[in-house]
A protein has these predicted regions:
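Flexible, glycine-rich terminal cap/loop adjacent to redox cofactors
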Residues: 8-19, 24-122
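N-terminal periplasmic "start-of-domain" segments of outer-membrane beta-barrel proteins
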Residues: 1-8
Length: 122
């Protein structure tokens, strides 16, 4: 079961599912979509608050497109992680999260941008 956790720091760090390191240690093939918060154009709130440090990272099964884990170190991470956890439990794919229509402007729009980029190499 995908149970989210959050460390309430500034900015918050939230996580759900397996980490990239855990998946690779088990020999699981994983596509990693990650982007520094400062480079996410679709996410204005961190810039407005002056908290642009951090990272949003998704581990995706390249065969099924299911999210295997996510780590969010950003403004509103404690809220965004709940959406990601629900998506994981419901079998929503990374592509469906990427193509979602979210409130504008909101931190949720980061999903469109982070998941749209090509996965990085191991």
């Amino acid at each position: 079961m995908a149970v989210p956790t959050t460390t309430f720091a500034t900015p918050p760090f939230a996580r759900v599912g397996a980490s990239e390191e855990e998946l690779r240690a088990k020999g699981v093939d994983v596509a990693v979509h990650a982007k520094p918060v400062a480079k996410i154009a679709a996410m204005p709130r961190p810039k407005v608050l002056g908290e642009t440090h951090g990272l949003i990272k998704f581990c995706v099964d390249p065969e099924t497109d299911l999210v295997l884990g996510a780590a969010l170190h950003t403004v509103d991470a404690q809220e965004l992680i709940n959406l990601v956890a629900l998506a994981m439990r419901a079998g929503v794919t990374a592509s469906e999260l990427r193509d979602g229509i979210w409130t504008h402007p909101s931190s949720t729009e980061a999903l469109n941008e982070v998941l749209a980029g090509p996965p990085r190499d191991a």
